[in-house]
A protein has these predicted regions:
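Bacterial N-terminal signal peptides
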Residues: 11-22
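Interaction/scaffold regions that mediate signaling and macromolecular assembly across diverse proteins
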Residues: 32-256
Length: 256
C-alpha cells in the first residue's frame, strides 16, 4: 500500500524537477543572448579588404569603434555559451588590437612601436571587459589558449602585423565558429607567402615555433589536416623525411 503511494510521489517530484530545470535553463539562456556584433560587422566590411586593414578609415570612424568596445565592455563572458564565449574573446582581442594601433596612428609602423623597453604592447592593461582591465596577453594566454585548447585560434587572432593571419571581414560568431576557424586556418596555411617547401625542408610560420605545444609538436601533421592540392600531396609523400624550419616574422603593420 505504502509503496503504491510513494512511487507516484517520487515520479511526480522527478517530473517537477525536469520542469524546473527546463524553466531555469530557458531563463538563463534568455539572460545571456549572443553578443551584438553589428557595429563591428559594419566596420570590418568597410575597412578590411583581403585581410588588410584600412587604419585611416578606422581612425575616422574611431567613435564607432569605441561604441563597439563599449558593447564588449558590458558583456559578462562567463554567462555566454561556450562557442559564443570563444568567439567573444577572439573578437575582443582583434577589436582592442585595432584600438591599440589607433592610439599611435598614423605614426605607427609596427605594433611593436607601441611598446617600450620595460613593457611590450601585449602587456598593456587597456582592455576593458565586465569591470576588469586586461592585457592582450591575458586574453590569449590566460583565456583563449588554456580554456579552449584549440590551435586554430592562432589563425583567428590578429596581431596587426603582415606575418600574422589576415583579419577576416566579419566577426567571429558562435553559431558558425567551427566553420570560420577552419576557413581562417586553411586560408593561412595554404597561402604561399606563409610556407615554402624545398625538397625535404619545410619553412612555416614562426607561430608553429612559438606555440609548438599547441600543435603537439607535429607541424606536418597539423598542416595535413588543412593543406590542399599539390602541397598536401608533397607533404604526404615526404612526411617521414621532412625537416621543419621557420620563416622570419614581418612585424610591419598589416595596413592597406
Amino acid at each position: 500500500m505504502g509503496d503504491r503511494i510513494v512511487r507516484p510521489l517520487v515520479a511526480g517530484f522527478v517530473a517537477l524537477a525536469f520542469v524546473i530545470q527546463a524553466f531555469s535553463g530557458s531563463v538563463y539562456a534568455a539572460a545571456a543572448p549572443p553578443v551584438d556584433n553589428s557595429i563591428y560587422a559594419e566596420l570590418l566590411t568597410k575597412y578590411v579588404v583581403n585581410g588588410h586593414v584600412n587604419y585611416a578609415g578606422f581612425k575616422r570612424d574611431e567613435a564607432r569603434l569605441d561604441q563597439y568596445l563599449k558593447v564588449l565592455e558590458q558583456v559578462d563572458p562567463e554567462r555566454l555559451q561556450r562557442e559564443e564565449q570563444f568567439a567573444f574573446y577572439i573578437n575582443a582581442y582583434n577589436a582592442w588590437t585595432i584600438k591599440l594601433i589607433l592610439t599611435g596612428y598614423p605614426g605607427v609602423k609596427s605594433i611593436k612601436d607601441l611598446g617600450s623597453l620595460l613593457q611590450s604592447p601585449w602587456k598593456k592593461e587597456f582592455v576593458r571587459i565586465n569591470g576588469k582591465t586586461l592585457t592582450l596577453d591575458d586574453i590569449e594566454h590566460t583565456i583563449l589558449r588554456p580554456r579552449f585548447k584549440d590551435p586554430r585560434v592562432h589563425f583567428a587572432i590578429v596581431c596587426a602585423s603582415k606575418s600574422c593571419p589576415p583579419l577576416i571581414s566579419e566577426p567571429y560568431l558562435g553559431a558558425v565558429l567551427d566553420a570560420q576557424l577552419n576557413r581562417s586556418t586553411r586560408d593561412f596555411l595554404n597561402t604561399p607567402a606563409n610556407y615554402r617547401l624545398d625538397r625535404n625542408t619545410f619553412w612555416v610560420s614562426s607561430i608553429f615555433k612559438w606555440f609548438a605545444e599547441d600543435f603537439n609538436k607535429d607541424v606536418v601533421g597539423f598542416y595535413l589536416k588543412f593543406a590542399q592540392g599539390e602541397l598536401k600531396e608533397k607533404l604526404q609523400a615526404g612526411r617521414d623525411r621532412i625537416d621543419v624550419t621557420y620563416l622570419d616574422y614581418d612585424w610591419s603593420l598589416n595596413g592597406v
